[in-house]
Amino acid sequence: MGLHFSKEEFRVRKSKVLDSMKDQNIDALLMFRQESMYWLTGYDTFGYVFFQTLILDKKGNTILLTRAPDLRQAQNTSNIKDIRIWVDKDGSNPTDDLKVILDELNLKGKKLGIEYEAYGLTGKNTLKLNKSLENYCSVEDKSDLITKLRVVKSKEEIVYVKKAAELADQALDEVWKYAKAGVNESKILAEMNKVIFEGGGDYPANEFIIGSGKNALLCRYQSDKQTLNAQD
């Protein structure tokens, strides 16, 4: 497994979630936020653009419902032992597969917390989910339950934060070597990313934002790469 944190770190995180669920009288939490799944189990994927959910009940049972392409992704990057697959084909409804799991966990008539505010839970899938759970259990929006726990960083997390800051500084230092008239922005970006990857880093959560000339004041990344002139 490609876990980046210790078993003890993950144990503590899970314990905090279970304590929070108990305080909020939640029998189970349905996670749709990829960042929640990663924080709790190490599960690393961009497959969240399709329907998938990580179920955690108050007994500590953890079950991932996802598509076949993410089976090995979950096996290789997370500590999740129970991985269920829903078949992605015309007419399939993954909330039916979810109900089977909820039945196994005896959650009918219970109170479920759901991460409704999640990029992975589209409006269409939300309608399916709500219809499936109607008259089955009670639900509450618990989108921020794990998010609030993630705010306070552990010692292991702070090590990564400091390393990321060091790499960011090194990448910025590299910029000044190439910020000259006649140099294309693509070259600058390439050198910045080279520093990050050679330093043991990874893709940033947000692309590096670079701009000169008419794009100098843009606040978002865009694909129009300029060649710097003497006035930039």
Show the residue positions of the predicted features.
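A composition/biophysics-driven feature that prefers long, compositionally simple stretches
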Residues: 1-170
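Hydrophobic pocket-lining residues that define ligand/cofactor binding sites across diverse proteins
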Residues: 21, 179, 196
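Short catalytic-site patches enriched in acidic/histidine residues
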Residues: 37-48, 133, 142-148, 152, ...
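Short, structured loop/turn "capping" segments at alpha-beta junctions
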Residues: 168-172, 202-203
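C-terminal helix-coil-helix/basic helical segment that borders enzyme active sites and/or dimer interfaces
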Residues: 176-183
